[in-house]
């Protein structure tokens, strides 16, 4: 199984288009300690020829250009992407579907709740129904979006997408709204969880024994955005568990047997984005890698 992290940042990327927080300012200045990053997306293949796209980032065209394995290969129209899978309905995970509208057949897989959020906005009807089949997937139901690639979706604590919030949203519920994906091929397992509000015992049990985990790295501490002076929301309010602190993902998963541990979906205010910073060194010392655009895994 092969996997490529197409986009490693949270919504808005790094640097964000209008942001001059300390980290974005470094990126705008070309400081090599802060790599530019596009928004969250992953490509997975059982053989390097046929690919599953997990989440369609607003930056998908840029990501495809940067990834030769995903370039058209023959004929007038072609893509090695056979299917797209959504783990939630967030803008940074669905907006890229609009870029994939150019008369190209593929299958779109998601839970009923996530598909309904897409169907609720008629702009996504540009994906012609006769070309893009929408396939509903049940939780804990194993299916093959690409032949040879077995996928099981499972609930993780989360919340509804920001654009669907009404009043005060329920945060941390385990429903079809936010899911993780267990992807298996050739006896190897990769877990992709780009959004998670907290680490539960059920999640710890499910992740035990995976060969690689790509996990929500949105915030280092719950108050990252507040400290940076660019927002008032905590990680919890956004539906994202912090890396550090009591209940943080590093501590919560420390005793779980996991092969490679990689943080993805990293917000522009997260100090781990600065190479060789105290935060980066601490995360790496705990056994985690900080994912970057173009990072490739072979399992």
From Swiss-Prot:
Keywords: PQQ biosynthesis, Transport. CDD domains: PQQB-like_MBL-fold. Pfam families: Lactamase_B_2. GO terms for biological process: pyrroloquinoline quinone biosynthetic process. InterPro entries: Metallo-B-lactamas, PQQ_synth_PqqB, RibonucZ/Hydroxyglut_hydro. Pathway: Cofactor biosynthesis; pyrroloquinoline quinone biosynthesis. The keyword Transport applies. May be involved in the transport of PQQ or its precursor to the periplasm. Belongs to the PqqB family. This is Coenzyme PQQ synthesis protein B. It comes from Methylobacterium nodulans (strain LMG 21967 / CNCM I-2342 / ORS 2060).
């Amino acid at each position: 199984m092969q996997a490529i992290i197409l986009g490693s940042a949270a919504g808005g990327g790094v640097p964000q288009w209008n942001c001059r927080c300390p980290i974005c300012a470094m990126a705008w200045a070309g400081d090599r300690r802060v790599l530019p990053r596009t928004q969250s997306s992953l490509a997975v293949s059982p053989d390097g020829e046929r690919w599953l796209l997990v989440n369609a980032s607003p930056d998908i065209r840029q990501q495809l250009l940067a990834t030769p394995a995903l370039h058209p290969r023959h004929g007038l129209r072609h893509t090695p992407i056979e299917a797209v899978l959504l783990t939630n309905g967030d803008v940074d995970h669905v907006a890229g579907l609009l870029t994939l509208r150019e008369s190209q057949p593929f299958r779109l897989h998601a839970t009923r709740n996530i598909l309904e959020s897409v169907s609720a906005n008629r702009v996504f009807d540009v994906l012609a129904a006769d070309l893009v089949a929408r396939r509903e997937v049940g939780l804990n139901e194993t299916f093959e979006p690409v032949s040879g690639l077995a996928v099981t979706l499972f609930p993780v604590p989360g919340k509804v997408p920001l654009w669907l919030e009404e009043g005060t949203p329920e945060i941390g519920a385990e429903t079809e709204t936010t899911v993780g994906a267990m992807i298996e091929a050739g006896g190897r397992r990769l877990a992709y969880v780009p959004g998670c509000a907290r680490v539960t015992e059920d999640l710890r049990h499910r992740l035990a024994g995976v060969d690689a985990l790509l996990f929500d790295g949105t915030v280092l501490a719950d108050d990252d955005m507040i400290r940076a002076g660019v927002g008032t929301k905590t990680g919890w309010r956004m539906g994202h568990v912090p890396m550090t602190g009591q209940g943080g993902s590093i501590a919560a998963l420390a005793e779980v047997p996991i092969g490679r541990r990689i943080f993805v979906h990293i917000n522009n205010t997260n100090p781990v984005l600065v190479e060789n910073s105290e935060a980066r060194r601490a995360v790496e010392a705990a056994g985690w890698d900080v994912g970057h655009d173009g990072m490739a895994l072979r399992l």
